[in-house]
Amino acid sequence: MAYLEELLEPFESTVLGTLGSNGYPFSSYAPFYYDGEVVYIFISDIATHAKNIQVTPKASAFFIEDESITENIFRRKRISLQCDAKKIDRESEQFAPIMQNFQEKFEGGTLTMLMGMKDFNLYALTPIYGEATFGFGEAYNIGGEKMNQLVTRTGDSGHK
């Protein structure tokens, strides 16, 4: 059984989909850290996707294989997670360990600099359902107790 943690390992950023106040979807991207259950993003409150999450605490996180890796554009590996979103307060006991993991993943000073900026905040994106596609006819739902496993499709898309 494949787990999301292995599948998301090569990715450093996720494409975010959020819902704007005008009712239209908005796409952007953000670096992320995944702990095996939750996708964490550290984004500025000035950014449109942060404002959207604050109003409608839901987001999609989309991960897609680089185009240069495959010979057939239609066979790109991709994972789409539909998530509930929640801001993690800087004062919470979760904040420091998650940010430490972020720093280890992205070895460099940029994240340290951003941590000092008060408009940047940590958000937890908790998957409630998702899909993974690895080529023609190789599609799975995301499921399991912690919503972190590939589950063979049975004809039901798993959407709520």
Segments and roles (model prediction):
Residues 38, 58, 129-131:
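Structural motif
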Residues 27-31, 80-82, 120-124, 139:
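Conserved hydrophobic/aromatic beta-strand scaffold that supports enzyme active sites
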Residues 48-105, 120, 127:
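Short, structured beta-strand-loop surface elements
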Residues 100-101, 105, 109-160:
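C-terminal edge-of-domain segments
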Residues 13-14, 59, 108, 112:
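A general structural signal for well-ordered secondary-structure junctions
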Residues 19-21, 28, 68-71, 109-114:
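Catalytic micro-motifs at enzyme active sites that drive phosphoryl/nucleotidyl and oxygen chemistry
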Residues 44, 64, 135-137:
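Surface loops and adjacent helix of pleckstrin homology
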Residues 1-54, 62:
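An N-terminal domain-cap segment
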